[in-house]
Amino acid sequence: MRKLKKYKPTRFMTKTSHYDKDAADYAVMFIESLCHTKGTWAGKPFELINWQEQIIRDLFGVLKPNGYRQFNTAYIEIPKKQGKSELAAAVALLLLCGDGEERAEVYGCAADRNQAKIVFDVAVDMVRFCPALSKRVKILESQKKITYLPTNSSYQVLSADVANKHGFNTHGVIFDELHTQPNRKLFDVMLQGSGDARMQPLYFLITTAGNDTNSICYEVHQKAIDIAEGRKVDPTFYSVIYGAAEDEDWTDPKVWKKANPSLGITVGIDKVKAACESAQQNPGEENAFRQLRLNQWVKQSVRWMPMDKWDACAFPVSEDDLEGRICYGEIGRASCRERV
């Protein structure tokens, strides 16, 4: 297990904020008192990997002068199989049971209820593995709701039609796989003002890169880039993006390691290698590998021809050399009625 050896507060911490080690230690201790719930890890203590602990200490330990958290929105973008669901479930339980908030409302959101249920189900199993929480929590599976009895707080999965509703008094939102959102309606309902009555709400957005640059996820992704590069300022916004640069060699194991901070722990390098070799032999898999394994934003999920091979066809051709040769024509019948 790769542990965080020496913590250094995020560069997004403002000059007026401070790092409260006790608050951060408490958050880490709460999460590490939980257990993993799946596969060979099931029942074992949830020991935070170094990158996970960095995020938790930044979010729960960086406080404003009034003692409340500086960051209200966290955007975590990372490849698949890095432990996203477990981290999101642990954060949900911390906001529900360990944040000292009376009648806290924590919501699980995703493109559909089944997707949101993934994190919820992990949280339910974490509760069942933890005797201290089990006797203080009521689980309503049929409603996809967990109630923490001492503070009458709840964590609930929302249905798809919630985008047409208002009136939430949000303390926490766990937004899983933001890149799959078909539009921005649910995002706006849950993040625009729903937590204004709370002193330190946390909107925890965790996702893999997508393939739609017109989506709400790409909008948030671009905001994260703009803040990191100094073009925008938002002291309440925190982001971490793990991935490969567009011009990096996607077949290089060093690039895999850079993009996958849990490589060798939650996912074996042999699995990534096999997926890469398959993508090299089957060009249609390349974009999926780049998107899901390297967290690169791609223009489509399946590519018929690698762009380097397409670009290699851009050489001058003499029409005289083509005279007398067979010519092929093509028409594209797309939904927008374009003609090629």
Features from the language model and the residues they span:
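Residue-level detector of conserved catalytic or cofactor/ligand-binding positions
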Residues: I331-V340
